A protein has these predicted regions:
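Substrate-binding/catalytic cleft of secreted carbohydrate-active enzymes
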Residues: 1-182
Length: 182
């Protein structure tokens, strides 16, 4: 994750207003620790985040705000996390699902493919809820259920040769996840 340009950068680049400080930066660093967004882009992000929280504030099934996914657009993480905690203290905060972890919020979240994993021996995570936010990605091209049977199908770890092997791989991931819970 994280190799896609943030929405503001794509739109601004398309409008020809964007001039990168270092034209080779994005080629050499597709996953910044904390992207350097200009103030106007950050303000737009915050306006949209506030609007989302305002619209969804009374939905009881929402228990966690997740501000970033896999570093996509992740910027000013501590500032944003502290703002969310103050603006809606009634919910947990996951600053970055599978992205760069910052010591703010309530959740430390890992994405691992194909099988789940969490580095339980890292003291920095001790005070946080540990979550495997994504795992699996096991692929099986079920005939009659493909968008385009002519295109290549995929799955993390490659495609198994049989449906039985696919099911076994899926069960193995679930068993590993169960052991992490213990």
């Amino acid at each position: 994750g994280g190799s896609e340009w943030p929405k503001w950068k794509r739109l601004n680049f398309a409008s020809k207003n964007y001039v990168p400080k270092n034209k080779n930066w994005w080629k050499d660093h597709s996953d910044p620790v904390n992207a350097d967004w200009p103030d106007w882009a950050h303000e737009q992000y915050m306006a949209e985040l506030k609007s989302m929280i305002d619209v969804l504030h009374n939905h009881p099934s929402l228990i966690v705000w997740t501000t970033f996914n896999e570093r996509w657009g992740q910027h000013r993480s501590l500032e944003i996390g502290q703002w969310v905690e103050q603006y809606d203290p009634s919910r947990l905060l996951n600053i970055a699902s599978g992205g760069n972890f910052f010591e703010v919020g309530d959740v430390a979240d890992q994405h691992k493919y194909p099988h789940p994993y969490f580095p339980l021996d890292m003291p920095i995570d001790d005070d946080y809820i540990k979550v495997v936010g994504e795992f699996g990605g096991h692929g099986w091209p079920e005939q009659g259920h493909l968008w385009d049977p002519e295109k290549r199908n995929w799955g993390y770890g490659g495609l198994p040769k049989t449906k039985v092997a696919y099911i076994e791989r899926y069960k193995e991931s679930c068993e590993i996840l169960g052991k992490l819970k213990k």
